[in-house]
């Protein structure tokens, strides 16, 4: 199935979706974006990996930076921070994050990168990696069947939002205070929209 037949999902949308489907829709359906200290720090952390001219060899491995990725089969497109190529030809994507590890949101993103690389290079990739700037530590990500299944599920859900233009309900939970789109999302108001609608119906029916 080619990209001409399905909506292309940005790889970056996968992490947004896993964090909050409403945040993902605001960014990738409505085109809304705002920075906060977390996103600014992330942008600064990516300055080095965003420059393809910085590709070089480290410890016997080629480090290719800012590599465009795509998958015709799954309708994906994006860019890898770093593609690590070992002397034996082994390839793995390495995602760079400025903060600390929280759950598997970034794991899904780097898994999607590996899926693209497998198609582009006609190869199999068993592991990827994520480098976190907070602890300055690299974590290995095993590309297990379960992780791939969750990644494909996220891709499917995101594509439905893109096609239908659906804006999910706001969760209005512990994620919201840290979200850079809080003032666009209005979680307190959105989460209570159904209650407000019922109240208005009751008032107008009197």
Predicted regions and their residues:
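Cysteine-cluster motifs in flexible loop/terminal segments that predominantly coordinate metals
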Residues: 20, 166-206
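Metal-dependent nuclease catalytic cores that hydrolyze phosphodiester bonds in DNA/RNA
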Residues: 1-91, 98-101, 192, 199-206
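Juxtamembrane/interface motifs at transmembrane-helix termini
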Residues: 45-48, 114, 147, 190
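Nucleic-acid nuclease catalytic cores
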Residues: 72-78, 84-165, 169-183
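A structural signal for alpha-helix termini and helix-coil/disorder junctions
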Residues: 31-35, 51, 157, 161-164, ...
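Short, charged/polar low-complexity linear motifs in solvent-exposed/disordered segments
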Residues: 43-44, 110-112, 157-158, 195, ...
